[in-house]
From Swiss-Prot:
This is Outer capsid protein VP2. GO terms for biological process: clathrin-dependent endocytosis of virus by host cell; virion attachment to host cell. Keywords: Capsid protein, Clathrin-mediated endocytosis of virus by host, Host-virus interaction, Inner capsid protein, Viral attachment to host cell, Viral penetration into host cytoplasm, Virion, Virus endocytosis by host, Virus entry into host cell. The VP2 protein is one of the two proteins (with VP5) which constitute the virus particle outer capsid. It is the major target of the host immunogenic response. Responsible for viral attachment to target host cell, probably by binding to sialic acid. This attachment induces virion internalization predominantly through clathrin-dependent endocytosis. GO terms for cellular component: viral inner capsid. One of its GO terms (molecular function) is structural molecule activity. The keyword Transferase does not apply. It is found in: Virion. The keyword Ubl conjugation does not apply. The gene is Segment-2.
Amino acid sequence: MEELVLPVISRQFDKKLLGRYEYVIELAKPEQDEWTNHDVTQIPGRRMFDVAQQGIRDAMHLKPLENDGEVLPRILDMSIACYDMRKTMMKKEGVDFVSNTRWLEWIIQDSMDVQPLRVHINEDHSTVQYDMFSAKVHIDSRKADTTSYHAIAVETKAERKCCHVRTEVWNSVVRNHLFNTAQESCYTFKQTYELIVNSERLSTEEEFRVGAPQFHTIQRNHRMQLGDNAYDKFLKGLVQLRVSGTTPAKIRDEVAALDVIRDNWIRGSFDRSHIKSLELCRLLSSIGRKMVNMEEEPKDEKDLSVKFQFRLDEKFSPNDPERNVIFTSKTHRTNEDRFYVLLVIAASDTNNGRVWWSNPYPCLRGALIAAECKLGDVYHTLRSKYAWGVRPTYKPKDLEREREKYVVGRVNLFDLEGEPATKVIHWEYELISPTYSVSNHKGNQCDLYPDDVEITTKFNEDRYREMIQSVIDDGWDQKNLKMYKILEEEGNPLLYDLEKDINLDSQSQVVFPSYYNKWTHAPMFNARVKPCDIELAERKNDDPFVKRTLKPIKADCVDLLRYHMSHYYDLRPCVKGVSLSIKQTPSGIHQALVQDDSYSRLLRRRDVDLDYSSPCPIITNYFLLEKFHILILTIMEKHYWELDDSDDVYEFPKIDASAFEVDGTLYDISQTIVHMYDRFFEKRRVLRSIDESRWILHLIRISQGRERLEVIERFFPNYGKAMRQRDFKKVRDVMFLNFLPFFFLTGDNISYEHRQWSIPIILYADKLRILPIEVGAHYNRFGVTCILELLNFFPSYEKREEKLEEDIVLCADAIVNFYLQTTISNGGVQTSIVSTKALLYEMYLSSICGGYSEGVLWYLPITHPVKCLVALEVSDALVGADVRIDKIKRRFPLSAKHLKGIVQISVHPNRTFSVTTCGIVKHKVCKKTLLKHRCDVILLQTPGYVFGNDELLTKLLNI
């Protein structure tokens, strides 16, 4: 068969007459007014695809459930490419072909453009109906296995020009944590507390009188706030406070639900059957998220939640040995309070220690917060009223802190409700040196002993030697080696925690830590931090880019990678608004990036026609990709063992737009990582493709031991040779080790296996030091943020030729062994969440730029004289047919030669249509009359080519 017929009908046409046609295009009602855009907010109510109407940042983490199944738009490209990779293999039956199914399985799993479809299935005619605003497409179910939507965000051409050729980069950049904005860590008096002035004195020499409170300038029962007169006197030790609980408005519903459970438990004579531990966990997790971080990255709380539920059942059991102590009748004890007492004890036992607001698990910190609403300072109340003290098995410091009251809690500035001029406590965080003046000859060794600073972070040499000896004896212990353990306790910013370090002593007087309002310099991290009071400058804003305080962290998305101590700030993807909107304004980050001095220079590196002043999100993402690429290569060039000996002084790591040019165009982080090894060790300028780069990193990550080394040697022979030889004599011989973490830390489709492990990095300082750098979801230590700033230090030309100390030689071998075995990147991902966001980003981009253009795309197989494909698309006319045809071709980056023809049908606002064909396909539009109905038909012809059978695509997809 060389001819195909596509009827094009109106809504009035009786579709029963067309039941035997394999494809039918049903036009929608003509538009009344001038047609400029579709109302995409109607999508959730139509049978199109599963994109819900909600906040855009929430939508990024949503698992699509309201759909009829998923389709992968590039599945044919992948399957055909795999078919082309076939190799002959001799079997008993003779010669057979074997496909690279391992590669095919990977590339399908690695795809980020899966579409969750919501279609209508017509059982009478065995057709699948794909809904659009401009038309409906009815496709025979035998032909519908590769049908997908082809959504396009229309480019703006007016005051600024967009470039939407590769819109998928935005999704990838966000998931690689390269599109984040930061707000510094912030603390306030706990919103679950009322801090009531109990007494006032005129000087610290005067004693507070027990039972005889005095009030000189402050009213009795005044509720103290940050920044008021009582607070000023509080800082001077002139007021005594009483702490009582209160319920913040944002968690009032959850606490009310807990109270219902509590009251049923009391009325039911404390029967454990009234305690639904799963429901309690759900409510407490909600409280923990709302009070600390509304948009916290989802954590796998399953195992901990089960443990917590077990502890809850245990504590509420009538046979629990502590129950009699808690239920002993005494003054100030109530059954209502006992419920929350048991909640906190269960949470503490689950945590094997005191629970704080900073606890990484929402359900545990939610238990503490809920109890604070009722009990005030929970652990003080437990000890003073319920004779319960922290257990000896808890951390030693938990015992020391038992008698104090802790009145500040960490809050997230993205979520904090607060008016301008409201006082908070925050951390100022600055790089000590944004750039260094260096030369190749002198290098850039870390100065661990800076002059004229208030507090300096120092290594504890005894603990450091113990760590090195343990590595020599037992190898690299990724779970127990920690950076904070090898630093002196005094001036250790990895141990600072204002929630624990600001307290009320036994006399209810405030105690601040010695580091408060002082700069702590941590030279190994090129960082200095200071906690101090600050005023809010802005109200809460849906745009995360709006800085809330007068002294915020000043860093763009790429510069943030240099802020190593990431527990001193919070992160959010820099997007605002909703998932579905006809028109909305983007985050202010795009305009801010355009103002960067290097914006136009970096964009000129790309071999495409761009508006170098456009704030289009795709163009700003191109800028971030280029900046990331240059920053990584600029830093890592100094860790390659070969270096020109020069006294020329330059700023490092300054971004040079002319540096590290490549043959090819950058679209993915993985290309930069792979190119780093190619560039320095293999002397290649060619940038590998996205699929090849991701495949290389995947193979390295899934292999272990000797197999991993063989994979590295296959793709990077010179680098692999250094790993295999392990000839550690001079400093230059171990410099390749700092490249190893990059194999495992980055990716938009990976998740870490752990919450907090450590990896080895060499620091070049007064001597070579091996440091345990922590990586994981805890404290936002994602991607290269955990290592990058330490890599700014590199050895001088002469240092490279120095003989290695014996301990470094022995540890280097252990480091190689660790990186050959580590499974850091094997945490697994929620594929249904990660892979289904392409349509979401396209819809969101359309609301920021020029609107949404729709289309439905499917394929027909050709069997003779060659096996190939013809693509057919029905779309609106908001985007030109030439643009759509180009986009269709881009769906076949691996097997473009097999796409021999394209049919593009554009539906206009008045419901006329135009047809464009290219390749082997020709067309003709005719009129058809059937009884009293009349319609158009599109006759498609492929002279000399024969359409294939129904199951040819099925066979191809099962090679």
